[in-house]
A protein has these predicted regions:
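Peripheral, non-transmembrane regulatory/ligand-interaction domains of membrane transport proteins
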Residues: 2-221, 225-228, 234-237, 241-244, ...
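Hydrophobic alpha-helical transmembrane segments and their immediately adjacent juxtamembrane loops
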Residues: 240-335
Length: 335
């Protein structure tokens, strides 16, 4: 299983497609190659950025046409769900990014029959990898419907873990920002970037959960007759989990907005402090510059030139002209 995951990551990094076939009759999934044999009685066909040949082979195993990427990306509700001739088609337009948290969002499509599930995706997914690892274990899933429900539960569980992790990171960031220290002020720019990255991840999770929620709602209301009615309880449980995650997402969004406002406020205060210092310096240095300019004139009628202590008097006046504004600023508590 570990070697299969390495092959999957390598193929994805090179932009190659992959077709993995899971069956109850084999201890590990098969990575299909053109011209190769296919394991019997497949339960789950997982396509990752598939080529035309992989699509054609998977469609032959499934006995139904697979959705194109444009079809899975459609945002119209009428294009997301359809059921005909014991073939159920479900699409999630925005599911996972191609490069962790940086790439564009990619869609996810399902084609479900009474005995088999086909999934079409265009990026790696933790929930899919986790389910693939237990497909051949003691609790092996017996039908495509079982695999589909387990995938939905796994997607929600992974989303919950990611939201919890983001919440912990935000708490740590809050402790760093709201600390009266020089280090806290120096990391404000980095904190601003971290808040933006967290907001991006929360938005991604929200988009994925919205797609999953609509799939589950559709199944609760319009599931075909060949889906066991006893499974509706699991559908409702998934929907309940998604509702709880939505509340947590909203709370996390509020905290992120507060953190963003706080960081921008600290940055604004630091800029104001700099402007205040520059203003004080400019005001304090104006009087001595005026005095020095007057006594630096080359007129013969300047009386201070003939004073015995004129130089000391001039220096004293320059220093005094600087001290008076400073004392006044101090009395106003501006310093």
């Amino acid at each position: 299983m570990q070697s299969l995951r390495v092959v999957s990551l390598l193929a994805h990094s090179q932009g190659l497609g992959m077709l993995k076939i899971y069956s109850l009759n084999t201890p590990s999934p098969q990575v299909w190659q053109p011209g190769g044999e296919t394991i019997s009685n497949p339960t789950w066909i997982d396509l990752i950025n598939p080529s035309d040949a992989e699509r054609e082979h998977a469609a032959g195993l499934l006995g139904a046409k697979l959705p194109a990427r444009d079809e899975t990306s459609a945002i119209e509700l009428s294009s997301r769900f359809s059921s005909a001739n014991s073939v159920l088609r479900l699409n999630i337009p925005l599911f996972v990014r191609t490069d962790g948290t940086k790439g564009p969002m990619t869609p996810l499509g399902f084609v479900l029959t009474p005995s088999m599930l086909a999934s079409v995706r265009y990026a790696e997914s933790i929930s899919f990898n986790q389910l693939g690892a237990v497909m051949s274990g003691a609790d092996a899933l017996r039908s495509g419907t079982d695999v589909f429900i387990a995938l939905m539960e796994g997607i929600v569980d992974v989303a919950a873990d990611r939201l919890e992790d983001l919440g912990n990171k935000l708490s740590n960031l809050s402790e760093q920002v709201f600390t009266d220290s020089r280090e806290a002020r120096s990391m404000l720019r980095r904190a601003l970037l971290q808040v933006g990255l967290m907001q991006r991840q929360v938005t991604q999770i929200r988009s994925a959960m919205l797609g999953v929620s609509r799939v589950i709602i559709y199944l609760c209301d319009s599931a075909p007759a060949w889906i066991d009615s006893q499974l509706h309880g699991r559908f409702r449980a998934i929907q309940g989990d998604i509702s709880s995650l939505s509340e947590f997402q909203q709370q996390l969004n509020d905290r992120l907005q507060f953190m963003l406002d706080a960081v921008l406020g600290f940055i604004n205060n630091d800029q104001n402090d700099i402007i205040k210092v520059l203003t004080i310096v400019s005001v304090v240095t104006v009087p001595p510059m005026i005095l020095a300019g007057i006594w630096g004139m080359n007129f013969k009628s300047i009386p201070e030139y003939d004073w015995p202590h004129g130089y000391a008097f001039g220096l004293s006046m320059i220093v005094l002209s600087m001290l008076i504004p400073l004392i006044w600023f101090k009395s106003k508590k501006w310093l």
